C-alpha cells in the first residue's frame, strides 16, 4: 500500500508545485473536521471552510490550510473558480442540493453518506454527475479498505458457493445526550434549508441525526456502510422489497429509534438482514460489527477490521480456513485510503471506489427502510419507475 508520504510526493511530481488540488469543506462539524485533516495530510490545500454555526467554522479554519477563506453560505464557495473539489459533510437533508449544485459548478465532490435523503434526490444526483462528468466519491470507506476489498474478491471468486442469506449486526452502547447551548452565531434558516420551517431549536440543531426531517439516525447512518458492502459484494443494484421494524427510541426527545432490524429481499434470489442495537454491551472484539455471507460451501464473516472463512468441517468454528485481522486499523486506514482514491480519481478522471450508482443503490434501501419503519408495512420497489409502494 502506498504510504502517505509517497502519495504526497508522487502527486507533487505529477502536478507540479503550483498544481495542488484545492478543496473546500462544507459542513465543519466533527466529521468535516476529521476529513479536513485527512485531505490536508494527503497534500490537498484546504482553501475554504463553510459552516452556518460559528464555532464549527472557527474550528475548521484552525485545521485548514493557512489563509483559508471562511463562508457561511455554500453557494458563495461554489463561485470560486480556483477550487477543484468540495467535501460535503453536512446534515443529510442538505446532501443532494449541495452535491448537484457543486457538480454543476464544475467541482468534484467527496460526499458523506448517506448520499441523499430520498430516492428521488439520489436519482437526481446520479443524473447530474453523469451529465457533468464530475468525480463524486460517496463516503462509504469500506470499499477502499483492503480487508473488505479482499473479502469482495473471495466472494467474486465463488469460494462460498451459492449465497442465499446475508446477516449483519451492529452493536454499541450510547449514553444520554449532554446538555448543550449555542456558543456562537447560527444561521438557523440557512441550516434548515429544504427541511420544514420551524422556530430555532438548539436541541434539534445539536441532535439533528435523530430527527426524520434531517436524517435517518443511527439506523441509516450505520446501515449505509453495511448495506452498501452487502450490495457491493453481491453485485446488487436494488431490492425487491424492504421491511423494517424497531422499538421506541431509548434516548429522550428524539424520533429515530436506535434498536431496529431491516429485512431486504433481492431479485438475485437472496435475503439480507441488518440489525442495529445501540443499547447493547459494546463488544471490544472483531464482532461488534459483523456481516456474515452464508454460502452453501463456506461462510464468510466480515468484521469491521477482519474476515474469516469457515467451511462445513470447521470444528466448533474455532479454526477458520483463512482469516485476516487488522486491529484498530479501520478508524484511520479506511478513511485515508478512501480519500486517497478520490484524489487519484480527480487526476485520472476515472470512477472512484464508491461511485454514485452504488450510493443510490444503498439510498434506495435506506429510504424504503425508513418508510417501512414509520408505516409498519412491507415496501416494494419498482426499478422501471424508480417508485415504491406498500
Indicate where each model-derived feature is located.
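N-terminal secretory signal peptides and thylakoid transit peptides that target proteins
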Residues: 1-11
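Hydrophobic/small residue at the entry helix of a nucleotide-binding pocket
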Residues: 31
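NAD(P)-binding Rossmann-fold cofactor-contacting core
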Residues: 44-62
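Conserved SAM-binding strand-loop segment of SAM-dependent methyltransferases
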Residues: 68-73
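N-terminal Rossmann-like NAD(P) cofactor-binding module of classical short-chain dehydrogenase/reductase
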Residues: 86-87
Amino acid at each position: 500500500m502506498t504510504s502517505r508520504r509517497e502519495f504526497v510526493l508522487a502527486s507533487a511530481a505529477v502536478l507540479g508545485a503550483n498544481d495542488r488540488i484545492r478543496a473546500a469543506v462544507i459542513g465543519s462539524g466533527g466529521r468535516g473536521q476529521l476529513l479536513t485533516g485527512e485531505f490536508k495530510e494527503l497534500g490537498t490545500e484546504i482553501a475554504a471552510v463553510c459552516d452556518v454555526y460559528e464555532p464549527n467554522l472557527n474550528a475548521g479554519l484552525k485545521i485548514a490550510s493557512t489563509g483559508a477563506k471562511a463562508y457561511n453560505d455554500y453557494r458563495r464557495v461554489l463561485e470560486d473558480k480556483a477550487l477543484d473539489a468540495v467535501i460535503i459533510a453536512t446534515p443529510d437533508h442538505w446532501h443532494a442540493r449541495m452535491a448537484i449544485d457543486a457538480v454543476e459548478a464544475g467541482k468534484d465532490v467527496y460526499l458523506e453518506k448517506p448520499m441523499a435523503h430520498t430516492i428521488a434526490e439520489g436519482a437526481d444526483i446520479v443524473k447530474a454527475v453523469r451529465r457533468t462528468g464530475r468525480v463524486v466519491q460517496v463516503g462509504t470507506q469500506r470499499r477502499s479498505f483492503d480487508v473488505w476489498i479482499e473479502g469482495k474478491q473471495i466472494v467474486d471468486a465463488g469460494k462460498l458457493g451459492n449465497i442465499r442469506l446475508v446477516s449483519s449486526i451492529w452493536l454499541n452502547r450510547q449514553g444520554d445526550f449532554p446538555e448543550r447551548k449555542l456558543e456562537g452565531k447560527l444561521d438557523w434558516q440557512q441550516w434548515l434549508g429544504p427541511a420544514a420551517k420551524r422556530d430555532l431549536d438548539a436541541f434539534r440543531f445539536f441532535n439533528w441525526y435523530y430527527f426524520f426531517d434531517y436524517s435517518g439516525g443511527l439506523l441509516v447512518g450505520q446501515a449505509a456502510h453495511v448495506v452498501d458492502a452487502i450490495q457491493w459484494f453481491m453485485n446488487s443494484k436494488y431490492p425487491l422489497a424492504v421491511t423494517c421494524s424497531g422499538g421506541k427510541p431509548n434516548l429522550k426527545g428524539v424520533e429515530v429509534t436506535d434498536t431496529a432490524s431491516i429485512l431486504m429481499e433481492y431479485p438475485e434470489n437472496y435475503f439480507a438482514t441488518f440489525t442495529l442495537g445501540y443499547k447493547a454491551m459494546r463488544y471490544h472484539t472483531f464482532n461488534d460489527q459483523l456481516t456474515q455471507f452464508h454460502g452453501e460451501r463456506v461462510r464468510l464473516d466480515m468484521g469491521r477490521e477482519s474476515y474469516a472463512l469457515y467451511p462445513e468441517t470447521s470444528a466448533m468454528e474455532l479454526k477458520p480456513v483463512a482469516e485476516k485481522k487488522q486491529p484498530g486499523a479501520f478508524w484511520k486506514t479506511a478513511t485515508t485510503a478512501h480519500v486517497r482514491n478520490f484524489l487519484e480519481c480527480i487526476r485520472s478522471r476515472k470512477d472512484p471506489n464508491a461511485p454514485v450508482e452504488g450510493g443510490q443503490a444503498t439510498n434506495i434501501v435506506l429510504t424504503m427502510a425508513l418508510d417501512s419503519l414509520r408505516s409498519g408495512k412491507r415496501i416494494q420497489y419498482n426499478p422501471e419507475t424508480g417508485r415504491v409502494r406498500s
